[in-house]
UniProtKB/Swiss-Prot annotation:
NCBIfam families documented for this protein: murA, PRK09369.1
Binding annotation for UDP-N-acetyl-alpha-D-glucosamine: R93, R122, P123, V124, D125, L126, K162, V163, S164, V165, D307, I329
Cellular component GO terms held in the UniProt record: cytoplasm
Record's protein name: UDP-N-acetylglucosamine 1-carboxyvinyltransferase
Gene name of the encoded protein: murA
Enzymatic class: transferase
Catalytic residues in the record: C117
Record's keyword annotation contains Cell cycle: yes
MF terms (GO), sorted A to Z: UDP-N-acetylglucosamine 1-carboxyvinyltransferase activity
A Pfam family this chain is assigned to: EPSP_synthase
Length: 424
């Protein structure tokens, strides 16, 4: 089992290059199933979820490889298999995105449900209902979602009941080859959806309105190849900005896009950070000061992102003053708080709200990561705590942060990865 050992009391300063967004790369990789010609993608991060996606695509018959510059090449012209198997899907819920392009182009597709994933309790039902509205017949058998269509998907007006990034992407991807016009209402507006639409349009799709709550897709007969660069990762950017803010440091995030982070930047300014932005950089300077507490309420984009909630929970635990954090997007997303309390943080949880009371310092401890964003907050806590922090289950971090310890060390953090030997 791999773990991180972090030695604390580091002030994080310097420059960091932001990677491509995993949340754009994943749907774009699956959307490449639609292409009848080769596709080249640049700025694709090296992450476990990306590797899993490439393995799923290879299982379907897509030829994939990374060149010496790190670009990912895909050729889906000879897909001969239509099942995304459990042994790959079980580690990544985003695998459901394989279903839409398969049924759209090949009239059939099967994707295993991830372990423990009940359709009624997960947003997977929104993916399925969207495809059904386009004419797909879907059954759940033997742990697989099986979809097929007689003839062709047919464009429809689809109102998504609850704003969902995943469902918006599934419907948009499927509708590119549907007959007629599809209109998605109450669509999610995230930049990763816009990036996926840009990619699809480069291949010959006719999509308008991505980035707004109404997306229109005019179906086309086929999609060709293209080259595309993945949009920068706004959540990684926000994470490094918080890292500097909680440590009193100064950071320049390069290869990023400030316009996708307005809500986060506003809150960091409220916390006392001096921030300057250019077209592709963000500079944050805390000038050695402790942050001020800020209230947070997560909302769909362009509101405050749920994927930054854990990082700001940490910020509030070491800030001056008290704060209220309300999580409106996901349930059970405060699992990092008990671990931060073990490090000396002060907070109470009432339903979907956490009340944080800032302390001057945290103390190193052995803590356990529970999910991607919670785990990075524990690593950052270790960077500023007194003493040594051990973070367990860091495979969560490897799913979403490229070369994280290398980047943190470049900013002055004392962090190392090690493998703990299991004794019988």
């Amino acid at each position: 089992m791999q773990k991180f050992r972090v030695y604390g009391q580091s002030r994080l300063n310097g420059e960091v290059n932001i990677s491509g967004a995993k949340n754009a790369a994943l749907p774009i990789l699956f959307a490449a199933i639609l292409a009848e010609e080769p596709v080249k993608l640049t700025n694709v991060p090296e992450l476990k979820d990306i590797d899993t996606t490439l393995k799923i695509l290879q299982q379907l018959g897509v030829v994939t490889y990374r060149d010496e510059q790190g670009a990912v090449h895909l050729d889906a012209s000879n897909i001969n298999h239509f099942v995304a198997p459990y042994e790959l899907v079980k580690t990544m819920r985003a695998s459901i995105w394989a279903l839409a392009p398969l049924v759209s182009r090949f009239k059939q597709g099967q994707v295993s449900l991830p372990g423990g994933c009940s359709i009624g309790a997960r947003p997977v039902d929104l993916h399925i209902s969207g495809l059904e509205r386009l004419g797909a017949k879907i059954v759940l058998e033997e742990g697989y979602v099986k979809a097929f269509v007689d003839g062709q998907l047919i464009g429809k007006r689809i109102v998504i009941e609850k704003v969902s990034v995943g469902a918006t992407l599934s419907i948009m991807i499927a509708a590119t080859l549907a007959k007629g016009i599809t209109v998605i209402e109450n669509a999610a507006r995230e930049p990763e959806i816009t990036d996926t639409a840009v990619f699809l349009n480069k291949m010959g799709a006719k999509i308008s309105g991505a980035g707004s709550d109404i997306i229109t897709i005019e179906g086309v007969e086929r999609l060709g190849g293209c080259e595309h660069s993945i949009v920068p990762d706004r959540i990684e950017t926000g994470t490094f900005l918080v890292a500097a803010a909680i440590s009193g440091g100064r950071i320049i995030c390069k290869n990023t896009k400030a316009s996708t982070l307005d809500a986060v930047i506003d809150k960091l300014r409220d916390a006392g950070a001096k921030i300057e932005v250019t077209e592709n950089t963000i500079t944050l300077d805390m000038q050695g000061n402790r942050p001020k507490a800020v209230n947070i309420r997560t909302e769909p984009y362009p509101g405050f992102p749920t994927d930054m909630q854990a990082q700001f929970t940490l910020l509030n635990m070491v800030a001056e003053g008290s704060s209220k954090i309300t999580e409106t997007i996901f349930e059970n997303r405060f699992m990092h708080i008990p671990e931060l309390i073990r490090m000396g943080g002060k907070a109470e949880i009432e339903g979907n709200t956490a009340f944080c009371h800032g302390v001057e310092y945290l103390s190193g401890a052995e803590v356990m990561a529970t999910d991607l964003r919670a785990s990075i907050s524990l690593v950052l806590a270790g960077c500023i705590a007194t003493g040594e922090t051990i973070v367990d289950r860091i495979y969560h971090i490897d799913r979403g942060y490229e070369h994280i310890e290398k980047k943190l060390r470049g900013l002055g953090a004392k962090i190392e990865r090690f493998t703990e030997k299991i004794v019988d």
